[in-house]
A protein has these predicted regions:
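Membrane-interface helix termini and inter-helical loops of multi-pass transporters
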Residues: 52-56, 105-117, 167-184, 228-237
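Cytoplasmic-side transmembrane-helix entry/capping segments in multi-pass membrane proteins
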Residues: 30-39, 85-98, 145-154
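Hydrophobic transmembrane alpha-helices of multi-pass small-molecule transport proteins
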Residues: 14, 36, 76, 88-108, ...
């Protein structure tokens, strides 16, 4: 239910933007089916899997497993896309970034409870794989479609799928009562769904699937540094080392190959 509300707030930002830029939902049946596939693979399915999985494993392990998204994308794109083959430089950069995520989040793996249920681990890994398939699918099947249209159509359809699933997964649906909860959902929807999806689909069009999914490496850095800045959490050597590994990995994986002379 909360994920459905979050996407609803995201639509409040995306629909006016689509209208102002003249982007209407297409009537072509084949294109609509592709957008529906993108909505399920990139939003509805991983949201449901992560929401379920994180009730059974620790947040640190969930962040590490979610960090496998670029690695899955690297493999899938190699076989699906002609212009995104595995190279030693790209593979090394992604592996280095993943090690950085492990270093950042390993402090949360100190207890057996953090590992949780194997099925919870499988759910989050499946979500990461779904994100990878979605990114590659968007690059292969929706290349050239405006990012505003991709974001609006996929979020609209994903929200419809989630609301249809609410009576099955959670009945009666929960309605938030606290103003702070609505404020948090609005913030997550506008920033985490509206702005994030616009940027994400722009990056897929401009950079390609593998390089676009590298943004998942940045999320743990942002969360931990916000903890330092806002919650006065200590700035540790582990945080600095993990950040340096991630930044180095991203720079290595996204650097354009040297021109041949």
């Amino acid at each position: 239910t909360l994920a459905a509300y979050r996407l609803l707030f995201g639509l409040l930002g995306l629909l006016p933007l689509a209208w102002m830029t003249g982007q209407a939902i297409p009537r072509d049946g084949g294109l609509l089916i592709r957008f529906l596939g993108l909505a399920v693979l990139n939003t509805a399915l991983p949201f449901a899997l992560i929401s379920w999985g994180e009730t059974r494993i620790g947040s640190g392990l969930a962040a590490i497993l979610n960090g496998s998204t670029p690695l899955f994308t690297l493999i899938i794109a190699h076989f699906w896309l002609r212009d995104e083959k595995i190279t030693p430089r790209r593979a090394a950069g992604l592996a280095l970034g993943f090690v950085g995520v492990v270093v950042l989040m390993s402090r949360d793996l100190g207890s057996p409870a953090a590992l949780g249920s194997p099925w919870g681990q499988v759910a989050v890994l499946a979500a990461s794989c779904s994100y990878a398939v979605a990114a590659t699918f968007a690059r292969a099947s929706l290349r050239g479609q405006p990012p505003v249209l991709q974001a609006t159509a996929s979020v609209l359809m994903a929200d419809a799928v989630l609301w249809l699933a609410v009576p099955v997964a959670e009945w009666p649906p929960r309605l938030p009562h606290l103003p702070g909860t609505w404020l948090a959902l609005g913030w997550l929807g506008l920033l985490g769904s509206c702005v994030a999806y616009l940027l994400y689909y722009y990056l897929i069009n401009a950079w390609g699937a593998t390089r676009a999914t590298i943004v998942t490496y940045v999320f743990p850095i942002i969360g931990l540094f916000l903890g330092v800045a806002v919650l006065r959490e200590p700035l540790t050597a582990q945080l600095v080392a993990g950040t340096l590994l991630i930044v180095t990995g991203i720079a290595t994986a996204t650097r354009a190959p040297a021109a041949r002379t």
